[in-house]
Amino acid sequence: MIKWPWKVQESAHQTALPWQEALSIPLLTCLTEQEQSKLVALAERFLQQKRLVPLQGFELNSLRSCRIALLFCLPVLELGLEWLDGFHEILIYPAPFVVDDEWEDDIGLVHNQRIVQSGQSWQQGPIVLNWLDIQDSFDASGFNLIIHEVAHKLDTRNGDRASGVPFISLREVAGWEHDLHAAMNNIQEEIELVGENAASIDAYAASDPAECFAVLSEYFFSAPELFAPRFPSLWQRFCQFYQQDPLQRLHHANDTDSFSATNVH
């Protein structure tokens, strides 16, 4: 059994958090032991700095808290926890929730409607999530609610609103915008050809640049084999920004599994 270095109690009365069990979700199994250790260290600090607030009867236990923290910290594994500054609370509903939405049309009329949301992220406010979709974020399917909302937070570090361009050097902005819009157009063309439900990338990515960055961040971490070959130039930009290469990580994990299987006697 691995003796995890993070299992250090803050006091004699505190029970060690179940980090090893929390790491057992499919999304995190490709991480090396060194990466897992680094991720847990970030997640421990995350839980010290942020407040998880269960709503509408949702029950939050230590395992759920650990897994939520791990998913929040995965995108900033190499960037650093300071990239998640600017909010202090995560509100968690048991299921998708209803909100009042107000929007203005092209002629200036203001409309109000109630819509169902999976999550929300405010620039200087809390992140709102729901547990059903968090659970669906544990696998490697291309869907990850927490990474989506974290991407919006990373996006807004570059200005007053999410633009689809995170905080990168000015000389890289034009190339980023070009590749992101090319990806949006490609996704839209597929939608027009096969329909939203049959599209290989979530159709929400074609709605605007901010959502494209957030959706493709989900695929970057949880389905790199779909993202990388389809948008290779944009993939390299994501690798450079996040300072991670999930596809290389996946290939290494698969090679390790294959080697282990061939050496079983």
UniProtKB/Swiss-Prot annotation:
Its EC number is 3.4.11.-. GO terms for cellular component: cytosol. Gene3D superfamilies: Collagenase (Catalytic Domain), Glucose-regulated metallo-peptidase M90, N-terminal domain. Its main location: cytoplasm. Keywords: Aminopeptidase, Cytoplasm, Hydrolase, Metal-binding, Metalloprotease, Protease, Zinc. Binds 1 zinc ion per subunit. It holds the Pfam family Peptidase_M90. Zn(2+) binds at H111, H148, H152, E211. One of its GO terms (biological process) is proteolysis. The keyword Metal-binding applies. Interacts with Mlc. Belongs to the MtfA family. This is Mlc titration factor A. The lineage of its organism: Bacteria, Pseudomonadati, Pseudomonadota, Gammaproteobacteria, Enterobacterales.
